[in-house]
């Protein structure tokens, strides 16, 4: 049945009549659905498609109306002629019209047949004035347009190029020829004169590509997210912009980190890799990074984000039965814990199907498939070695559980595999010699959306190739080795998420031939590093994949490292690149897990906050060799740890972020660390802390909120953040019992329990006061009563007190001498003081055992103290976090536990281990 515009209008009229009758509450959902359908009927795009359909059926398919080809060049009659110059026009971007025609995009509707459309503007996308449209439609024969919905779902609307529009001076347009349509670049389709709609320019020969990498609008979903700015800002980090694209040449603004506990995390809708289109009314497409940051900073307390994200790729789980042949299972794998094939994904992936093997003959397993299990052995969250072992230890009949991507699209970042033989280690028990079989194209049925980064070794050309990288805030995102005796410079590590990783063009084992035309074939390591460092923002690298050379080089380096370690243990000498070594003892000020450090050059060494490490070789800028020092002596195990420089560099990169909080009050030029020093050293009377000063200190943490971020992100911190790494220490013998300072939630109960359980080991000191003695009090037992206020103030100025305060116009304080008296009696003096007292005791040569109780969460605090309300627990948790931030380097140890008993037992153990007589104290030397 032919489509008529009158039929569309009648359907619209009937829908509107039916909608008006839906007045009951229970009809609300149905009414909303009908309104969406009405909006589609009234949209300008829908009207244009009806015009095309009607013209196609009424004019082109009607033989009497066919026009003689010989008259194609003649002007048509006025009824089919438009004056192009008089037509207003606008562009419709691909972002404004996703294929779903959802209400989140702009709606264009006619008020009646003869008037231009009115503006119906959604703030999500654009503020352009809407008029008659000039739109591109992707290449499609008109004969394929058999229904409107099918046409819409296969069309891509994109901005029209000015050079492709018909010049305004053209008085007429050529006649439309009879089907099939010749290959003219642009044709203009008139409609019947009764409707008189605006013209639609249909480009049948070209398609404007999307401004976004890897995918068209059909691959994305859109969402509006409203966030309320909290004390820590919006709680996410961004990267990208026209001046520093985050992924390839895509200038979009991407979400790179969601901060735990922040506004975005609490809302739960925003995701990493979401692309921000608008912030409130500000369009942040195709803007610089700083413009996007400014838009977020100036957005106010309620922030509306309009984002788009790639639709998730669904997976189909299936079981495949393979029968081993002479070539084994006949496929290769990559991935696993500690050896991720795709950044952020520990899964095991199929990277190669070997021709003639069991998998190839079966035909079901494809490159890009994810292996979930082999027989009854789970392959999720396992190492690469464990997966290989599981596959090799199978019988002749093997059952594979695999996850197959079911997405139908293939985009720029994906490619169908070429079936070639494997030069990498296949997963089978019979590895045949590698031989080149040529590039045999796979059948379409075997195409799968597998990333180019997932292809095997022999898909990588062995010829020199040119790669262009754009430097991120922390560099190019790869490590190099080599440069000795002209052996070449090789890439040894690709940083996940860095520029090199995101480009997908470099890999471990590449030899760097040149950097920005600087020949590095015979360069030393230092020369190569300098060339890369000074290469500027855009770096052109010529690289050649040489895995065999790199493997030989890596084996040699490993042998040298082993020799270095052995000689270091036996004689204390020997180094890879330096003959002189530094040896020192340090206290770790952070936890280190070697399994999470992918850049380790050799066997790593785990440690926790407060551990003492004997660094036996600190000659290298990036890595040190060390042994752990225990109460029983030094461990025999020698391992590699990150150097102070490396720790601080990585932590500063992690802390780089955009602060989306509002403008700070006062002292904007003064860093948090400056204030810490001022609070710690500059106050002559620390007890004189008025209300304003206290409020200012409380707000400091709020004004310097940071969040985790990735490489290519900006920092709006005023000054460089102080990073804790290692503290140099010396061993010292003490002839006193060390004081004990416990900080954090539940400290009072821990203190009381220690004195109650071990009254012979723990005690408290007698404080000083200028308050008059009461009748029942004894001087020296209850207080040391000071008759002269001036004298006590003088003693405070001379640092004879570790802490003092004022109450009811009387001074109270704890003197160094009072603490010393308890210590010399062989008891641990339990001190209820602030973190500032730790440093003052150290200056007085009374090194305390300072233990911080770090709560795991608000709920953890409420579980241990059930009398607290949620608000009290929240404030306690915040105070603890601020305490940790301010005094971490002065803590002897940090403890955490689920119960009070657990924490108490840890505290007792730490005090026992740290009691002496040999203790580690801060050294004066600098690292």
UniProtKB/Swiss-Prot annotation:
Membrane topology summary: Peripheral membrane protein
Entry-linked CDD domains: GMPK (cd00071), PDZ1_Dlg1-2-4-like (cd06723), PDZ2_Dlg1-2-4-like (cd06724), PDZ3_Dlg1-2-4-like (cd06795), SH3_DLG1 (cd12031)
Region (Disordered): 691-719
Modified residues (Phosphothreonine): 115
Domain L27: start-end pairs: 4-64
Residue span, PDZ domain: 230-317, 325-412, 474-555
Positions of the Guanylate kinase-like domain: 683-858
Ranges annotated as biased composition (Polar residues): 704-717
Gene3D superfamilies to which the protein is assigned, alphabetical: 2.30.42.10, Guanylate Kinase phosphate binding domain (3.30.63.10), Helix hairpin bin (1.10.287.470), P-loop containing nucleotide triphosphate hydrolases (3.40.50.300), SH3 Domains (2.30.30.40)
Name of this chain's protein: Disks large homolog 1
Species annotation: Canis lupus familiaris
Gene: DLG1
């Amino acid at each position: 049945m032919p489509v008529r515009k009158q039929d569309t209008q009648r359907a619209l009229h009937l829908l509107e009549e039916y909608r008006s009758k839906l007045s009951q509450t229970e009809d609300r959902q149905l009414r909303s659905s009908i309104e969406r359908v009405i909006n589609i009927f009234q949209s300008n795009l829908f009207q244009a498609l009806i015009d095309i359909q009607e013209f196609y059926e009424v004019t082109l398919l009607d033989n009497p109306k066919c026009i003689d080809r010989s008259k194609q060049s003649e002007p048509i009659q006025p009824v089919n002629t438009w004056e192009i110059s008089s037509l207003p026009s606008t562009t419709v971007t691909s972002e404004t019209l996703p294929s779903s025609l959802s209400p989140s995009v702009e709606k264009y509707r006619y008020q009646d047949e003869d008037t231009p459309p009115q503006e119906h503007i959604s703030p999500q996308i654009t503020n352009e004035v809407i008029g008659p449209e000039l739109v591109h439609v992707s290449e499609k024969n008109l004969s394929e347009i058999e229904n409107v919905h099918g046409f819409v779902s296969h069309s891509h609307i994109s901005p029209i190029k000015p050079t492709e529009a018909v010049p305004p001076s053209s008085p007429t347009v050529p006649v439309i020829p009879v089907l099939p349509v010749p290959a003219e670049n642009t044709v203009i389709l008139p409609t019947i004169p009764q409707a008189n709609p605006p013209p639609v320019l249909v480009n049948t020969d070209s398609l404007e590509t999307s401004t976004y990498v890897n995918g068209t609008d059909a691959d994305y979903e859109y969402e509006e997210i409203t966030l309320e700015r909290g004390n820590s800002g919006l709680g996410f980090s961004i990267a990208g912009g026209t001046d520093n694209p985050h992924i390839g040449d895509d200038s979009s603004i991407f979400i790179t980190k969601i901060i735990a506990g922040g506004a975005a995390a609490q809302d739960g809708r925003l995701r990493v890799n979401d692309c921000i289109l608008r912030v409130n009314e500000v369009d942040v497409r195709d803007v610089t990074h700083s413009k996007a940051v400014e838009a977020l900073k100036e957005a106010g307390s309620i922030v509306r984000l309009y984002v788009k994200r790639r639709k998730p790729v669904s997976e189909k789980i299936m079981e495949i039965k393979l029968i081993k042949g002479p070539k084994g299972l006949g496929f290769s794998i990559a991935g696993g814990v500690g050896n991720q094939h795709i950044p952020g994904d520990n899964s095991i992936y199929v990277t190669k199907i070997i021709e003639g093997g069991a998998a190839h003959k079966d035909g079901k397993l494809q490159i890009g498939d994810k292996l979930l299990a082999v027989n009854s052995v789970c392959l999720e969250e396992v190492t690469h070695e464990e997966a290989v072992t599981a596959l090799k230890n199978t019988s002749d009949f093997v059952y594979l559980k695999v996850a197959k991507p079911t997405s139908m699209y293939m985009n720029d970042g994906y490619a169908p595999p070429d079936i070639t033989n494997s030069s990498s280690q296949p997963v089978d028990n019979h590895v045949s010699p590698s031989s080149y079989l040529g590039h045999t194209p796979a059948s379409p049925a075997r195409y799968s959306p597998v990333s180019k980064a997932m292809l095997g070794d022999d898909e990588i050309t062995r010829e020199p190739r040119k790669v262009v990288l754009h430097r991120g805030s922390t560099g190019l995102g790869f490590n190099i080795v080599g440069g000795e005796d002209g052996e070449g410079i090789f890439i040894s590590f690709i940083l996940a998420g860095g520029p090199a990783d995101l480009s997908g063009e470099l890999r471990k084992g590449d030899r760097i031939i040149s950097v920005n035309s600087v020949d590095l074939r015979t360069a030393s390591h230092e020369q190569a590093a300098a060339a890369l460092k000074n290469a500027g923002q855009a770096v052109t690298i010529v690289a050649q994949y040489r895995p065999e050379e790199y493997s030989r080089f890596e084996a040699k380096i490993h042998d040298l490292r082993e020799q270095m370690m052995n000689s270091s243990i036996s004689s204390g000498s020997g180094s890879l690149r330096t003959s002189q070594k530094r040896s020192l003892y340090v206290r770790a000020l952070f936890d280190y897990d070697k399994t999470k450090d992918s850049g380790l050059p050799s066997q790593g060494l785990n440690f926790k906050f407060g551990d003492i490490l004997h660094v036996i070789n600190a000659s290298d800028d990036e890595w040190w060799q060390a042994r752990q020092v225990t109460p029983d002596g030094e461990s025999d195990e020698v391992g590699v740890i990150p150097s102070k420089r490396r720790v601080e560099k990585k932590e500063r990169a992690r802390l780089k972020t955009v602060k989306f909080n509002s403008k700070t009050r006062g002292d904007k030029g003064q860093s948090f660390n400056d204030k810490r020093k001022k609070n710690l050293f500059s106050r002559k009377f620390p007890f004189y802390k008025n209300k304003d000063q206290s409020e200012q200190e409380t707000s400091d943490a709020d004004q310097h909120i940071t969040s985790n971020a990735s490489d290519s992100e900006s920092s709006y911190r005023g000054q460089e953040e102080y990073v804790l790494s290692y503290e140099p220490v010396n061993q010292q013998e003490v002839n006193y019992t060390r004081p004990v300072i416990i900080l954090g939630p539940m400290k009072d109960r821990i203190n009381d329990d220690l004195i109650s359980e071990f009254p012979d080991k723990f005690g408290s000191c007698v404080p000083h006061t200028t308050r008059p003695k009461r009748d029942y009090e004894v001087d020296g037992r209850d207080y040391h009563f000071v008759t002269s206020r001036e004298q006590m103030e003088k003693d405070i100025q001379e640092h004879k007190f570790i802490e003092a305060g004022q109450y009811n116009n009387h001074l109270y304080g704890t003197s160094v001498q009072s603490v010393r008296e308890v210590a010399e009696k062989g008891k641990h003096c339990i001190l209820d003081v602030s973190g500032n007292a730790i440093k003052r005791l150290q200056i007085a040569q009374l090194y305390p055992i300072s233990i911080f109780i770090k709560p795991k969460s608000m709920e953890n605090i409420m579980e241990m103290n059930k009398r607290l309300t949620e608000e009290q627990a929240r404030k306690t948790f915040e105070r603890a976090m601020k305490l940790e931030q301010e005094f971490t380097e002065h803590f002897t140890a940090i403890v955490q536990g689920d119960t009070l008993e657990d924490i108490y037992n840890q505290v007792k153990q730490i005090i026992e281990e740290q009691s002496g007589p040999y203790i580690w104290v801060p050294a004066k030397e600098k690292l």
